[in-house]
Amino acid sequence: MDVMMQFSRERLEQDASFSAIYVVYHGFQSWICIFAPVLTALPVLAVKLSETESGLTRFVSVRLNHKKKLTGVCNFYLLAGATVLVTGFLLFCLITFAFFPSLNRYSVDSVYQINSQLYPDGSMIGTAYHKGGAPAAFLLYLSGLFLYGISCNAIILFCSSLSNNMYVITCLPFFFHYSCERISTLLSINLAENTSKTIHRIVNALNPNAFVHSFLYPVDHFWIWTYHSVRTALCIIAFIAICKRRSRYDFLI
């Protein structure tokens, strides 16, 4: 929106970096660390608020001792949060394509240059683009975004087992993501050049944006996916353990 207010349509059509598809991929990822924890928390907040207003909080807490109920709640929170994130991205795409020029309006050289930046060789999205074109690359990115939503919502899932307070459920995951992003960035800057590549890769994997970047750029996927998988699994295990304990001793914040 700020770009649209500062530049005319003619100015936007002179620079291919203002093309809609470029803004979609590189504009959204710069804000994903901020918006992902908030968007993925919406289904959890909706359920918690409905439980509080209906006065069924303690009843639900007791039912969470049932294995099927607990599994259903866990799956709903994870999948619903990821779906909200993908839906938010699709709305962003619609707005972007409505206000920014199509890539086809630029010269052949500009299109080639932008495509080489959007779909670099050796990246997952680049491989998908060369095999199935732009639709395949876009679907791959949506899949990665969905998985990232599950990873983000796992932390929210854990926080929801500790408290029913909406500020705790929203702010703690946001603080965690922002802190990890800042710590990873500072460590990456201050690491000496003679530090082993493995340490560099581990530090980079701590960055919340690294998971999305693993689909867009030719990076080492092992440490990034391992970190997010382990983090998600630990959050789910902690959620199940805490909810079972809550159902027995009935403590709520």
PLM segments and residue spans:
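Membrane-helix interface segments
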Residues: 65-67, 149, 165-169
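Residue-level recognition of pore/gate-forming positions within transmembrane alpha-helices
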Residues: 77, 174-178, 232
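Central hydrophobic cores of alpha-helical transmembrane segments
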Residues: 166-180
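Secretory targeting signals
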Residues: 2-51, 75-153, 157, 161, ...
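Transmembrane helix boundary and interhelical loop/hinge segments in multi-pass membrane proteins
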Residues: 44-62, 66
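Amphipathic cytosolic juxtamembrane alpha-helices at the membrane-cytosol interface
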Residues: 64-78
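Transmembrane helix-loop junctions in multipass membrane proteins, especially transporters and channels
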Residues: 93-108, 165, 189-196, 243-252
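Junction motif at the cytosolic side of a transmembrane helix
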Residues: 158-162, 229-253
